């Protein structure tokens, strides 16, 4: 009998073991769809980004008008740009839901997979930040100025570091050029990291909603989960295309329709919605270095999750107190996102400070404490 090429060819064998014959727990829910959705987001962003880069000019005098030219004169340029800008929002929606799933179901106990995932999140945040600067509108320019300026809070080397990053004494042409280079490069780094992420995942196999070993009950990935993933793609592309076609500027900032002007500061400088929770934490501390450290900690705290897991059960499926705490954390993140979009005045200052303290308290103190308490209550 002739050997099955899919199982014997060195390259096809890898694809087969990752996407076709991969043993998958039979009970994984729709929350396990977000990994593949993130993959399709990345592919969409790279494709639309490549098409946009063909018409973009990374120069302060031409950047704004080159984006306008793409939208006005290039065939379907407006659609490509709208899909790319809103695709970033969907990328972040998917990654936040993906992290939330991992947190709820204790997937962080696969330490290598979890840690590479956080590195992926940080790379994605960096990519989105440098990308936001490229249209060279008012919010692009001032966002770049404010965020890069945060590095000056680093003792001793801060100011030198910022001027080195800028390529001068302010955000200017060299900054835009290097940001474009970085924005082109980083998605490919994300693609590489994704392969590492998947390699670590396939070492252990997927977790499942019950958090128990599922080796006795696994089914092939294809056709069951390929079909389920395609349904997921459809359900994501529908709202994405609707947003890009009907209200493409809903999530953007009106300030970005004004070309960058170093002499006029916008009344409220704020990042895109997906960074607002971290921005609120940054603003809630009146000290510059303290704010920067809190900003970094807001994401880096995720690295501690595996070490703060004190419960004897892996998932929160059968732990009602932890579930309650989890949903309080989610609500708290929504409050932080809302506060980050508001001006720095009473009562938003105090709400932001309380929400920031609550965020770290829940993650660092309450989750381990409640986990230990539940062990006692369940006589573990």
From Swiss-Prot:
The chain crosses the membrane at residues 34-54, 78-99, 114-134, 179-199, 227-247, 289-309, 321-341, 348-368. Keywords: Electron transport, Heme, Iron, Membrane, Metal-binding, Mitochondrion, Mitochondrion inner membrane, Respiratory chain, Transmembrane, Transmembrane helix, Transport, Ubiquinone. GO terms for cellular component: mitochondrial inner membrane; respiratory chain complex III. Binds 2 heme b groups non-covalently. It is a multi-pass membrane protein. It is found in: Mitochondrion inner membrane. Heme b b562 binds at residues 84, 183. It holds the Pfam family Cytochrome_B. The keyword Mitochondrion applies. GO terms for molecular function: metal ion binding; ubiquinol-cytochrome-c reductase activity. Its main location: mitochondrion. Its cofactor is heme b. SUPFAM superfamilies: a domain/subunit of cytochrome bc1 complex (Ubiquinol-cytochrome c reductase) (SSF81648), Transmembrane di-heme cytochromes (SSF81342). The keyword Nucleotide-binding does not apply. GO terms for biological process: mitochondrial electron transport, ubiquinol to cytochrome c. Heme b b566 binds at residues 98, 197. A ubiquinone binds at residue 202. Component of the ubiquinol-cytochrome c reductase complex (complex III or cytochrome b-c1 complex) that is part of the mitochondrial respiratory chain. The b-c1 complex mediates electron transfer from ubiquinol to cytochrome c. Contributes to the generation of a proton gradient across the mitochondrial membrane that is then used for ATP synthesis. Belongs to the cytochrome b family. Heme 1 (or BL or b562) is low-potential and absorbs at about 562 nm, and heme 2 (or BH or b566) is high-potential and absorbs at about 566 nm. The cytochrome bc1 complex contains 11 subunits: 3 respiratory subunits (MT-CYB, CYC1 and UQCRFS1), 2 core proteins (UQCRC1 and UQCRC2) and 6 low-molecular weight proteins (UQCRH/QCR6, UQCRB/QCR7, UQCRQ/QCR8, UQCR10/QCR9, UQCR11/QCR10 and a cleavage product of UQCRFS1). This cytochrome bc1 complex then forms a dimer. This is Cytochrome b. The lineage of its organism: Eukaryota, Metazoa, Chordata, Craniata, Vertebrata. The gene is MT-CYB.
């Amino acid at each position: 009998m002739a050997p099955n090429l899919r199982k014997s060819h060195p390259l096809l064998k890898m694809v087969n073991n990752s996407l076709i014959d991969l043993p998958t727990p039979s009970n994984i829910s729709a929350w396990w769809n977000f990994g593949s959705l993130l993959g399709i987001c990345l592919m969409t962003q790279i494709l639309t980004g490549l098409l946009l880069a063909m018409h973009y000019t990374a120069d302060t005098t031409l950047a704004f008008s080159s984006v306008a030219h793409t939208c006005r004169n290039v065939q379907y340029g407006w659609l490509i740009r709208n899909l790319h800008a809103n695709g970033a929002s969907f990328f972040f929606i998917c990654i936040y839901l993906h992290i939330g799933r991992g947190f709820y179901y204790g997937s962080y106990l696969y330490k290598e997979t979890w840690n590479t995932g956080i590195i992926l999140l940080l790379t994605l945040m960096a990519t989105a930040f440098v990308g936001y600067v490229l249209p060279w509108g008012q919010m692009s320019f001032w966002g770049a100025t404010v965020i890069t300026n945060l590095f000056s809070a680093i003792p001793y080397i801060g100011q030198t570091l910022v001027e080195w990053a800028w390529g001068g004494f302010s955000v200017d042409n060299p900054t835009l050029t290097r940001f474009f280079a970085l924005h082109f490069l980083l998605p490919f780094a994300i693609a590489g990291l994704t392969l590492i992420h998947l390699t670590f995942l396939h070492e252990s196999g997927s977790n499942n909603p019950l958090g128990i070993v599922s080796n006795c009950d696994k089914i092939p990935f294809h056709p069951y989960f390929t079909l389920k993933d395609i349904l997921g793609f459809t359900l994501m592309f529908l709202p994405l295309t609707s947003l890009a076609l009907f209200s493409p500027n809903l999530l953007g900032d009106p300030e970005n329709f004004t070309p960058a002007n170093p002499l006029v500061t916008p009344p409220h400088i704020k990042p895109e919605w997906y960074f607002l929770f971290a921005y609120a934490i940054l603003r809630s501390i009146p000290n510059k270095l303290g704010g920067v450290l809190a900003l970094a900690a807001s994401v880096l705290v995720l690295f501690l999750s595996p070490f703060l897991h004190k419960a004897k059960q892996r998932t929160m499926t059968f732990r009602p107190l932890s579930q309650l705490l989890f949903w309080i954390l989610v609500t708290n993140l929504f409050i932080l996102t809302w506060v980050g979009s508001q001006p720095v005045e009473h009562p938003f200052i105090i709400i932001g400070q309380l929400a920031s303290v609550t965020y770290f308290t829940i993650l660092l103190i309450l989750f381990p404490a409640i986990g230990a308490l539940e062990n006692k209550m369940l006589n573990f």
